[in-house]
């Protein structure tokens, strides 16, 4: 039996521009089950990032509900820490902190002691092939290594779902495949669902479900 972990129910997002209303998302519905891999494609400006921000409680819908773990939430910092992880095209690592220091931060914020957080970070960085780069600064890492650190940081609290916005968009094709393979491997080991926005159709077709966002609506592709 599937275990639904995130639902967008009749979600709309509208912006007013002068006397006009721009309908970015229009009565959109999406159900995400535990461990499910979902890709969303669409043209630039179609609302893909807006959709992720609403799903991740970083933005509010004009209408509709965001339901996480069977509860409706408008915005909640603790829910984001416990249930959601985020990965972006830019790694957003703190340049003055080492790889492992960047990774342990969400764990410490979530209440873990430093020893436990370090052990968890070592384990996940090692699984991503960075066991020998724990104490490197971001500037000492390649682009692919930086993004793997960002992936480790997003997974450190074992979230139920990862929201990924073009997670390999800045990487060359070879590095893209290497990073994406490791990302899927660790997510599957943790039974973490992924919702990924991407322009890379090859990666999109490797997911369980593929949706296209067009005219504010999601359609199975």
From Swiss-Prot:
Gene Ontology BP annotations: lipoprotein localization to outer membrane; protein localization to outer membrane
Keywords: ATP-binding, Cell inner membrane, Cell membrane, Membrane, Nucleotide-binding, Translocase, Transport
UniProt superkingdom: Bacteria
SMART domains named among the record's database cross-references: AAA
Chief subcellular location: membrane
Location relative to the cell: Cell inner membrane
EC number, UniProt record: 7.6.2.-
Ranges for domain ABC transporter: 6-220
Broad enzyme group: translocase
Gene Ontology MF annotations: ATP binding; ATP hydrolysis activity; transmembrane transporter activity
InterPro entries: AAA+_ATPase (IPR003593), ABC_transporter-like_ATP-bd (IPR003439), ABC_transporter-like_CS (IPR017871), ABC_transpr_LolD-like (IPR015854), MacB-like_ATP-bd (IPR017911), P-loop_NTPase (IPR027417)
GO CC annotation, single: plasma membrane
Positions that bind ATP: 42-49
Disulfide-linked positions: none
Membrane topology: Peripheral membrane protein
Pfam families assigned to the protein according to its UniProt record, in alphabetical order: ABC_tran
Function comment: Part of the ABC transporter complex LolCDE involved in the translocation of mature outer membrane-directed lipoproteins, from the inner membrane to the periplasmic chaperone, LolA. Responsible for the formation of the LolA-lipoprotein complex in an ATP-dependent manner.
Complex and partners: The complex is composed of two ATP-binding proteins (LolD) and two transmembrane proteins (LolC and LolE).
Similarity comment text for this entry: Belongs to the ABC transporter superfamily. Lipoprotein translocase (TC 3.A.1.125) family.
Name of the molecule in the record: Lipoprotein-releasing system ATP-binding protein LolD
Organism of provenance: Rickettsia bellii (strain RML369-C)
Gene name tied to this protein: lolD
